[in-house]
């Protein structure tokens, strides 16, 4: 069930992504245009399980999970752009290039994920992604996801 306003709530996200707690890292899609871009949000809570060890007394959202959140946003954009996949097909995170971390993300932050579709060829799609907190870039990267059959 897709809304006409180009937003997606958590129930709609769960229909598209196979991820579940504690690894579902997109809370809401704020806006998207098929084949072009997507803006989503990840609310960073102190209750996230990894904050116990990353780092005690100075909790920082792990950089690899920022990349994973951006990858999940690219997966949602890919699903919304291509439509339903064949049974047994999934989008897999295939590559990340030029990742740069500009500022830490901490509990209480709201991370805005912005992904832009670049091109698709033979089931492999390229995207550019940016994660922002309070309008400031926290992370940026180029990413690829691939449409593949589950084995």
Swiss-Prot record:
Biological processes, Gene Ontology terms: fatty acid biosynthetic process; lipid A biosynthetic process
Catalytic residues (UniProt): 54
Pfam family name, one: FabA
Molecular function per GO: (3R)-hydroxyacyl-[acyl-carrier-protein] dehydratase activity
Chemical reaction(s) catalysed: a (3R)-hydroxyacyl-[ACP] = a (2E)-enoyl-[ACP] + H2O
Gene Ontology CC: one annotated term: membrane
EC number: 4.2.1.59
InterPro entries: FabA_FabZ (IPR013114), FabZ (IPR010084), HotDog_dom_sf (IPR029069)
Location of the protein in the cell: Cytoplasm
Keyword line: Cytoplasm, Lipid A biosynthesis, Lipid biosynthesis, Lipid metabolism, Lyase
Top-level taxon: Bacteria
NCBIfam families: fabZ, PRK00006.1
Homology family: Belongs to the thioester dehydratase family. FabZ subfamily.
Function: Involved in unsaturated fatty acids biosynthesis. Catalyzes the dehydration of short chain beta-hydroxyacyl-ACPs and long chain saturated and unsaturated beta-hydroxyacyl-ACPs.
Entry-linked HAMAP family: FabZ (MF_00406)
Identification of the protein by name: 3-hydroxyacyl-[acyl-carrier-protein] dehydratase FabZ
Organism, as annotated: Pectobacterium atrosepticum (strain SCRI 1043 / ATCC BAA-672)
Source lineage: Bacteria, Pseudomonadati, Pseudomonadota, Gammaproteobacteria, Enterobacterales
Gene: fabZ
């Amino acid at each position: 069930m897709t809304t006409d306003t180009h937003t997606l709530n958590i129930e709609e996200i769960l229909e598209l992504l196979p991820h579940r707690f504690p690894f579902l890292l997109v809370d809401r899609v704020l806006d998207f245009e098929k084949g072009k871009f997507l803006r989503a949000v990840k609310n960073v809570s102190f209750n996230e399980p990894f904050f116990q060890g990353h780092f005690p007394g100075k909790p920082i959202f792990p950089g690899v999970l920022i990349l994973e959140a951006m990858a999940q946003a690219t997966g949602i954009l890919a699903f919304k752009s291509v439509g339903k996949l064949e049974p047994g097909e999934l989008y897999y995170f295939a590559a990340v290039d030029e990742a740069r971390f500009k500022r830490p993300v901490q509990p209480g932050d709201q991370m805005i994920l912005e992904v832009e579709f670049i091109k698709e060829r033979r089931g492999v799609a390229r995207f550019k992604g940016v994660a922002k907190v309070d309008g400031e870039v926290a992370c940026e990267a180029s990413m690829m996801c691939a449409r593949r059959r589950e084995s």
